[in-house]
């Protein structure tokens, strides 16, 4: 199981990303707008720098919902590969069966 601090750090990052999503999108639209003047774009870059770095969605990590494991996580289930195997072997995931050919 992952350390609680790492899991909480990711949760804080998710909350920050959600909080600043609209503001980030508006500022990035000005920065990427080719019709905006250089001054407007420069001011937008300064405002963009004032947003916390952890508000960027790219800094989030997908983790297993049960263990917090950061790697080997399946998006479809939100679980790590080890937990998927355990749960699938018990037959608790509908439609998932052990492969045989």
From Swiss-Prot:
Keywords linked to the UniProt accession: Ribonucleoprotein, Ribosomal protein, RNA-binding, rRNA-binding
InterPro entries referenced in this protein's UniProt entry, alphabetically: Ribosomal_uS14 (IPR001209), Ribosomal_uS14_bac/plastid (IPR023036)
GO MF term list: rRNA binding; structural constituent of ribosome
Function: Binds 16S rRNA, required for the assembly of 30S particles and may also be responsible for determining the conformation of the 16S rRNA at the A site.
HAMAP family assigned to the protein according to its UniProt record, in alphabetical order: Ribosomal_uS14_1
Family from the record: Belongs to the universal ribosomal protein uS14 family.
Protein name stated in the entry: Small ribosomal subunit protein uS14
Source organism of the structure: Neisseria meningitidis serogroup B (strain ATCC BAA-335 / MC58)
């Amino acid at each position: 199981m992952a350390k609680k601090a790492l899991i909480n750090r990711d949760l804080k990052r998710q909350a920050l990303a959600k909080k600043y999503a609209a503001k980030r999108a508006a500022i990035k639209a000005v920065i990427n707008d080719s019709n905006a003047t250089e001054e407007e774009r420069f001011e937008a870059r300064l405002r963009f720098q004032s947003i916390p770095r952890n508000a960027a969605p790219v800094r989030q990590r997908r983790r297993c919902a049960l263990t917090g494991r950061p790697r080997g996580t399946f998006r479809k289930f939100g679980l790590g590969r080890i937990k998927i195997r355990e749960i699938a072997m018990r037959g608790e995931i509908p439609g998932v069966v052990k492969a045989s050919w």
